[in-house]
């Protein structure tokens, strides 16, 4: 039986009595954000709104984005990435579980030196895919041109943020490339791999 989103007590500054809020609302107040689903317009708008609001509230405290996502739509993913670059606070990205496709693109978009993967996390990169398998030829050609532009944009970002040469990133994006946390670190997608049972990072 589903139990819904758990609620936890929260006491606002200056208030005597605590109120019950859902756990994600409580964590947002600590600047901890979550991408735990496929990337679509709804979650993109939520995360963009939260990042902008929290930046207005305090532009000196870092934000932390936890990622466990199979990927999703390219444009909503790019809007999350662009917002991360735009807001004044540094955005830490933390991969737990899987960061695939647009999930890995958002992961690599964290502040360089502040991108982390948990030890058993997996990362996957590949090129954007088309949704027009049975479209008329004209529409298919237009979409193919747009896909090439999007692929070029994504490739440039991976090159810039991983430090890998263009030919390496282009080759990797030809197919699904899965990586362990350590391989993602070697590839420049994350900077740190968490060490189990300690507060240190490797």
Swiss-Prot record:
Its main location: plastid. It is found in: Plastid, Chloroplast stroma. The active site is at 101 (nucleophile), 126. It holds the Pfam family CLP_protease. Its EC number is 3.4.21.92. GO terms for molecular function: ATP-dependent peptidase activity; ATPase binding; serine-type endopeptidase activity. Cleaves peptides in various proteins in a process that requires ATP hydrolysis. Has a chymotrypsin-like activity. Plays a major role in the degradation of misfolded proteins. Belongs to the peptidase S14 family. Component of the chloroplastic Clp protease core complex. This is ATP-dependent Clp protease proteolytic subunit. It comes from Liriodendron tulipifera. The gene is clpP.
